[in-house]
Regions:
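Phosphate-handling DNA/RNA-contact segment within nucleic-acid enzymes
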Residues: 1-7, 20-22, 42, 116-124, ...
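N-terminal structured subdomain of primase-like DNA metabolism proteins
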Residues: 1-115, 171, 177
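Hydrophobic alpha-helical scaffolding
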Residues: 14-18, 70, 74, 85-89, ...
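Conserved nucleotide-binding/hydrolysis micro-motifs of P-loop NTPases
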Residues: 54, 75-76, 231-232, 278, ...
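Amphipathic alpha-helical segments at domain termini/boundaries
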Residues: 94-125, 129, 153-156, 352
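Terminal amphipathic helices with adjacent charged low-complexity linkers/tails
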Residues: 161-163, 168-169
Length: 352
């Protein structure tokens, strides 16, 4: 949806002119070595090992005349803009700006309404970064003893805690909200970011996350879009709680550790899909950085599409308990109609 507004914010014909004035083979050629035997420069027909997954054969094809690429291995496809976006790990508009500079085009002024939506998202992302820092600060404070004891019991090192920016939400109702209000952030923006709740009776807002270990969820551009929180109270109604859906966060279209795993997967030629945050973090500590987790009890079709974009045959690692086996069966039911050449699944059922 966000890309839709960015498209609208650019004048008609600008993206088409940008694509026409850009050489896809030059853009891609900075990232790959062309296979000389298969490549026919005169026809604009280029082949190389895919830059998005690990392979020895040249299955990545660029049609320079049409301006499109396609990988016959991992099925990654697109144009010069999408290639820059995915290979440089930048947003759509940042990719457009990079390509425009290379093509010698000046970026036009954008539509005010569409620009307003982009500015709102940037503001929410800034609020989320403030929350990340607040939770990290609280984790290092005296009120987080139980949280630190739990993390210590899981064997996590200081380095891995810092890498994943693990934090703590205090148990009182308004600690984060008050912190953000004191920074001049408006109440409605704190709610829009998914960090606070306004009661139905119109009373004062209160923090969504209280008494929880906090895990920032970042998108592929590295921006914090949501949080996951693990309750310290064994009697809490929900052991794990995610952010509600916001302008930044669509749970069914997001993965935990997506950006890092996508990069690491190319080197490892593998992808592990774990059950939750702690599984991904533990795997990373032991060198398996190519791991992601869904943000709920079941993998959605959109998440499965994201997973297959990272690797054509991911390993689904699930606990061998009843819940884990049920999750495996649900995923099998979801995946079976979608299986095709270059898209499959492997399952690793872990012992209890």
């Amino acid at each position: 949806m966000r890309e839709h507004y960015i498209h609208m914010s650019l004048p008609p014909g600008f993206l088409e002119e940008l694509r026409n004035r850009s050489s896809l083979s030059q853009v891609v050629g900075r990232k790959v070595t062309w296979e000389q035997k298969k490549t026919n420069i005169a026809k604009g027909d280029y082949w190389a090992p895919c830059p998005f997954h690990s392979e020895k054969t040249a299955s990545f094809h660029v049609d320079d005349k049409k301006g499109f690429y396609y990988c016959f291995g991992c099925h990654e496809k697109g144009d010069a803009i999408s290639f820059i976006r995915n290979s440089e790990n930048v947003s759509f508009i940042e990719a457009v700006e990079i390509l425009a500079r290379e093509a010698g085009l000046t970026m036009p002024a954008r539509d005010p309404k569409a620009q307003e939506k982009i500015d709102i998202n940037k503001e929410l992302a800034s609020i989320m970064e403030n929350a990340v820092q607040f939770y990290k600060m609280q984790f290092n404070g005296s009120n987080a003893k139980n949280a630190k004891d739990y993390i210590k019991s899981r064997g996590l090192t200081a380095d891995i805690i810092n890498t994943f920016e693990i934090g703590f939400a205090p148990g009182d109702r308004t600690s984060l909200s008050q912190f953000l209000l004191n920074k001049g952030i408006k109440e409605n923006k704190i709610i829009d970011a998914g960090l606070a709740i306004k009661p139905d009776d119109g009373g004062n807002i209160f923090d969504r996350f209280r008494g929880r270990i906090m895990f920032p969820i970042r998108n592929t551009q590295g921006r914090c879009i949501a949080f996951g929180g693990r309750a310290m109270d064994p009697n809490a109604r929900a052991k794990y709680l995610n952010s509600n859906e916001t302008a930044l966060f669509d749970k069914g279209r997001s993965l935990y550790n997506h950006a890092t795993a996508r990069e690491a997967s190319g080197k490892a030629n593998s992808l592990i899909v774990a059950e939750g945050y702690m599984d991904v973090i533990a795997l990373s500590q032991f060198g398996f950085k190519h791991a992601v987790a869904p943000l709920g009890t079941a993998i959605t079709e959109n998440q499965l599409a994201l997973i297959w974009r990272i690797h054509h045959e991911p390993i689904i690692a699930l606990d061998g308990d009843t819940a884990g086996l049920r999750a495996a069966m649900r995923l099998i039911d979801l995946a079976l109609p979608l299986l095709e050449a270059g898209k499959s699944l492997r399952f690793c059922i872990l012992p209890l």
